[in-house]
């Protein structure tokens, strides 16, 4: 997969705290075990007026015309709380989100997001509030994420974030668990060549 070094995109301001994984992707859509096809069910209860998903809720922010094509999700604290379903980051990624910004994330959701090549950025509540205000006042304008510098540029202001160096390395280089293993392929082959034949 491609590395995520820098990204510019529109922001959806989801003005809610404690958004749980059941809100992100309800349990009735969890039967599938592939990562594709969940985007259309993202925020199902909030996004649609009917169970068949034929009528969009015009009052839900994801349906606002000015946020169509957004790739960055902005939310309040404790994003991704609730059950530890990996389908939640699958749905967000399948919809098109690449980056999430919030004051805090549920631990399992945070790790699942990184494992699925999405970047969850933690900023202070005050900084997140500033970004909400900027997004509301600057419809249609993009913000810029630089993972190499670990900065978020919003208008003329730069915010700095932290990320574990191992996770940063994986995102920058587009590495999943298999890719990480293959980085050590020569060492693995050398080790296996020393194993007695009867143990192979």
Swiss-Prot record:
Keyword Ribonucleoprotein assigned: no
Record EC number: 4.2.1.33
Enzyme class name: lyase
Substrates-to-products reaction catalysed: (2R,3S)-3-isopropylmalate = (2S)-2-isopropylmalate
Gene Ontology cellular-component terms listed: 3-isopropylmalate dehydratase complex
InterPro entries: 3-IsopropMal_deHydase_ssu, Aconitase/3IPM_dehydase_swvl, AconitaseA/IPMdHydase_ssu_swvl, IPMI_Swivel, LeuD
Pathway: Amino-acid biosynthesis; L-leucine biosynthesis; L-leucine from 3-methyl-2-oxobutanoate: step 2/4
GO molecular function: 3-isopropylmalate dehydratase activity
Complex formation: Heterodimer of LeuC and LeuD.
Homology family: Belongs to the LeuD family. LeuD type 1 subfamily.
Protein name: 3-isopropylmalate dehydratase small subunit
The species this protein was found in: Actinobacillus pleuropneumoniae serotype 7 (strain AP76)
Lineage: Bacteria, Pseudomonadati, Pseudomonadota, Gammaproteobacteria, Pasteurellales
């Amino acid at each position: 997969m491609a590395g995520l070094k820098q990204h510019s995109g529109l922001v959806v301001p989801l003005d809610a705290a404690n958004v749980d994984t059941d809100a992100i992707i309800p349990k009735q859509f969890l039967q599938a075990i592939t990562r594709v096809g969940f985007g259309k069910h993202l925020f199902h209860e909030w996004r649609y007026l009917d169970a068949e998903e034929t009528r969009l809720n015009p009052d839900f922010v994801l349906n606002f015309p000015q946020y169509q094509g957004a790739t960055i999700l902005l939310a309040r604290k404790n994003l991704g709380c609730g059950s530890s379903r990996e389908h939640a980051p699958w749905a967000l990624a399948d919809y098109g989100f690449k980056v999430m910004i919030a004051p805090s994330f549920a631990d399992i959701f945070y790790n699942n997001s990184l494992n699925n090549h999405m970047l969850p950025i933690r900023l202070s509540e005050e900084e997140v509030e500033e970004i909400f205000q900027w997004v509301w006042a600057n419809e249609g304008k993009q913000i810029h994420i630089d993972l190499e510098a670990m900065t978020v540029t919003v208008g003329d202001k730069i915010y700095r974030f932290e990320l574990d160096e191992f996770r940063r390395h994986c995102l920058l280089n587009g590495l999943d668990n298999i890719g990480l293993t293959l980085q050590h392929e020569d060492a693995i082959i050398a080790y296996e060549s020393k194993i007695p034949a009867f143990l192979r």
